């Protein structure tokens, strides 16, 4: 009788949802660990989107396998973009330290547009397995303009997440997977194939 009761707990919807939530928390923790060398931010983020794409329709699971498959996919292109991201953010940070309002505003605009391009890049890579660098760049650039409101919403969500992390750093481990899931949902609305 005790064994039957335990089986019923395991088979409940609540338990199933708990497994999914824990998988997203584990995915977020894995993302944070792989992002520790800053140069791997873009490959790690693309891997998160790859994992979520693999989970569509199948449920969650196989986190580590899918994650490293996602990192391996387009690794060179993503590493190049990570390096470019570090350089651009460093230069924009230097620009924001200037005392003139025009340069500060220019810095924020560049930062916003590049962040939107980065989100579009990650989305395009997660949706297309065999694609050239030029095609990724072209599709990402178009998405910055055609999916402008979605990209802005994702940037605001990520900014809120960063501010939350500054308030209490352990939140990054708890909420990273969920934030990337929300970003994925926002970017895929209306783009389902």
Please identify what each model-predicted range represents.
Residues 1-193:
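Helix-coil boundary and N-terminal low-complexity module in membrane systems
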């Amino acid at each position: 009788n005790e064994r039957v009761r335990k089986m019923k707990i395991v088979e409940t919807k609540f338990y199933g949802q708990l497994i999914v939530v824990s998988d997203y928390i584990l995915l977020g923790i894995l993302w944070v660990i792989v992002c520790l060398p800053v140069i791997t931010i873009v490959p790690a983020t693309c891997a998160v989107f790859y994992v979520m794409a693999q989970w569509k329709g199948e449920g969650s699971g196989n986190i580590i396998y899918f994650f490293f498959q996602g990192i391996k996919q387009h690794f060179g292109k993503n590493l190049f973009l990570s390096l470019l991201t570090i350089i651009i953010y460093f230069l924009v940070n230097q620009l924001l330290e200037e005392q003139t309002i025009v340069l500060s505003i220019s810095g924020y605009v560049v930062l916003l547009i590049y962040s939107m391009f980065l989100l579009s890049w990650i989305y395009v890579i997660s949706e297309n397995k065999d694609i050239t660098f030029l095609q990724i760049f072209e599709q990402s650039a178009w998405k910055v303009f055609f999916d402008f409101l979605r990209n802005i919403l994702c940037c605001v969500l990520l900014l809120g997440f960063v501010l939350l992390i500054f308030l209490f750093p352990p939140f990054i481990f708890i909420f990273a997977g969920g934030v990337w899931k929300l970003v994925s949902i926002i970017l895929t609305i209306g783009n389902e194939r």
